[in-house]
Amino acid sequence: TFLMRKLSKKILSLYAKKAIIGLASVAMVATMSLSTINVSPVKGATTSSTLVWSDEFNGNSIDASKWGFEIGTGSNGWGNNEQQYYTNRTDNAYVADGALHIRAKKEAYGGKNYTSARLNTNGKFTFTYGYVEARLALPSSQGIWPAFWMLGANIGSVGWPSCGEIDIMEAINAENKTYGTCHWNANGHAEYGKPTGNFDITQYHTYGLQWDNQYIRFFVDGNKFYEMSIANNAGDTDEFHKPFYLLLNVAVGGNWPGFSIDDSAFPQE
C-alpha cells in the first residue's frame, strides 16, 4: 500500500501579498508518519501577510468545505494514460492522527488494477499570486507518480493547456529527485521546468512555490532551484496571471513514469 502521508499541521502554506494560506504537511509513502509543521514566516511572506486559508487535518475526516475528489479514470487516463482508478473511499484517502493520507493500492476496481485518490480545491478555494508550500515525504518505487500541483481555475472553459499548470512537485519511479514545471499554451503546448539535484525524497522536505506578476519560483527546503519569468506575459504566459486551484494526488503508471510497475511495492492488505 502506498501512502501519500499525512498532511499534518500546516502541510501547505500560501503567502499572498497581504495574505497567507496555510495547509499542512504531506507525505506520500509506503508507511505513515509525519511531524507537525507550524506556520512561520517563510519566503514570500511579509510582516503584513495574513493567513487566508489553511487545513490542519485535525478532525476525523477530510474537510469537504476545502477539498473535493476527482473520481474515475479521466479522459485517456487523465490525459497521461495513468493506470489507476481514483476514488473518494477512505481506503484511498483519509484523515488520521492529524494528517491526510493518500494511499495507492493494488486492486481490481472500475476496470483498472490500481486505486488511488486525487484531491483538489476547485470551486472551494482559488488564488492568484502568493507563496504556497507543503512538507512532503514521497514514495519511491517503479511506476509511482506523486504530485503537488496547481491548475488554472478556468480549465472548464478554455481547456488544457490554455488554463495553465504549475507542478510544484512531481516525482516518478525510484528517482532521488523531484521536478518543478510550468505548462501553458503558446501556439501549442509549451512547458518549461527543471529537476532538483539528488536527495532522499522518502524523507520529509518542504516544497514551496513563490508566485508573483514577475516570476514563478520553485523551492525545496527554502532553496530555490528554478524560476521562470512571466513578466509582461513573456512567452505568451498570460495564463499565469489568473486564479489557480491546488491538487494533491498519487498516480500509478502513465506516459511519464512508464508502464512497468513494481507490484511488489504494494503490500497485500
Please give the residue ranges for each predicted region:
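Bacterial Sec-dependent N-terminal signal peptides
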Residues: 1-22
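Polar/charged alpha-helical tracts
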Residues: 9-14, 40, 65, 97
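Sec-dependent signal peptide cleavage junction
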Residues: 29-48
